[in-house]
Regions:
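N-terminal leader/targeting pre-sequences
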Residues: 2-88, 93-189
Length: 189
């Protein structure tokens, strides 16, 4: 049943491209990004790393597609396959690239950075200031999510998408938290 994820990925790319082209001013440059990886344990040069094979098995895959333009903001889509069936995961854009530990990806990328670390204030840790891609897998272990924010990246950029253990909390003191960091995919936002 590998054709369904491939068709879903193609549909997401086409949808993102049509969104950016239909509303973007002709003089507004559109930035596209795409990343794909098959999760493995960490090794030097790995771009898709699993830290918890019980929740993100080796061989699971992730695809990230994104468009960004001043006229439309930033839209990011995530498609995953091979994860646990019927499971809720959190996922976010993170400030750093993947590394040997999930912590190496750094904090969530925030358009307006929270001066307090770690950031758990819903004023900063929210789906308008961060890229949140929470999803629930189907009975095949396939999931997808889309985020649209009204800002674009400047000189500071996110460098990865991290899959977390649970959906993202929104309450004060816990905003932006989503449990353990399970896996990481390098993305050149």
């Amino acid at each position: 049943m590998r054709i369904a994820p491939t068709l879903l990925s193609a549909a997401l790319v086409a949808g993102l491209a049509s969104l950016s082209g239909a509303t973007a001013d002709a003089a507004t440059p559109v930035h596209f990004t795409s990343a794909h990886g098959t999760f493995t344990g960490y090794a030097s040069g790995a771009h898709a790393v699993t830290y918890r094979t019980d929740l993100v098995p080796g061989g699971a895959q992730a695809h990230v597609f994104g468009t960004s333009a001043h006229a439309t903001g930033t839209t990011t889509a995530l498609v995953v396959t091979g994860l646990l069936p019927n499971h809720q995961y959190g996922a976010h854009a993170h400030a750093n690239a993947c590394g040997p530990s999930g912590d190496d990806a750094g904090p969530h990328f925030q358009h307006t950075p929270d001066p307090v670390k770690p950031s758990v204030d819903p004023t900063y840790a929210n789906p308008r200031n961060e890229i949140w891609l929470d999803f629930t897998t189907d009975h095949f272990g396939t999931g997808h999510a889309k985020s649209t924010v009204d800002w674009t990246f400047g000189s500071r950029r996110a460098h990865s998408v991290v899959i977390h253990e649970t959906h993202t909390h929104t309450d004060a003191g816990h905003a932006g938290t989503a449990g353990a960091r399970l896996a990481c995919l390098d993305v050149a936002f």
